[in-house]
């Protein structure tokens, strides 16, 4: 599945990977108080739709929501381990692999493009988990980065030619950093 960058329905899609975009559903990770974007089962159903995984309404239970949050946090810790060059936590690998082993919905092509067959939450979480396995265990694993923005913890795949991208979004965090540097430079002159 090709990543769609940007913000949709209150969710940020800046990671360049479905798995990394899913980790952004817990916002403000670098602040004292995080902001949970998946507060209710309905929020998870909205995220599936915003991510392009579900065309039809998905029935999400409280148990599904708990499983989704656990998968999200495992993905986040695994990606941070990749960023830091640390070993991948075994418990998180087991959780990710357990989700990735589940059956996934089948993509189908129609006149408007690719759509996913109707699926339940575990199958959609399997799609996210497989994206995580492929990213964190594949050739782009060394291109996973964390935004250098002061308060931003978004993870992304650095697809820049040089491999030195610093921010999740040049128009957001990148611009803020450049403005702060400019102001600091002018203050000291």
Feature locations, PLM:
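Short, surface-exposed, polar/charged, turn-prone segments marking secondary-structure boundaries
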Residues: 40-41, 49-51, 173-176, 183-184
């Amino acid at each position: 599945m090709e990543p769609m960058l940007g913000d949709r329905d209150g969710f940020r899609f800046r990671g360049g990977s479905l798995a990394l975009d899913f980790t952004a559903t817990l916002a403000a990770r670098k602040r004292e108080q995080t902001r949970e974007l998946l507060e209710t089962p309905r929020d998870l159903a909205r995220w599936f739709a915003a991510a392009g995984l579900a065309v039809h309404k998905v029935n999400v239970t409280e148990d599904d929501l708990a499983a989704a949050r656990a998968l999200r946090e495992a993905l986040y810790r695994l990606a941070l381990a990749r960023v830091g060059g640390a070993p991948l936590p075994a418990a998180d690998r087991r959780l990710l692999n357990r989700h990735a082993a589940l059956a996934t919905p089948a993509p189908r092509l129609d006149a408007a493009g690719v759509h996913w067959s109707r699926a339940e939450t575990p199958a959609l979480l399997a799609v996210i988990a497989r994206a995580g396995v492929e990213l964190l265990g594949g050739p782009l694993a060394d291109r996973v980065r964390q935004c250098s923005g002061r308060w931003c913890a978004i993870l992304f795949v650095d697809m820049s030619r040089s491999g030195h991208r610093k921010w999740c979004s040049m128009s957001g965090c990148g611009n803020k950093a450049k403005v702060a540097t400019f102001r600091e430079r002018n203050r000291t002159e």
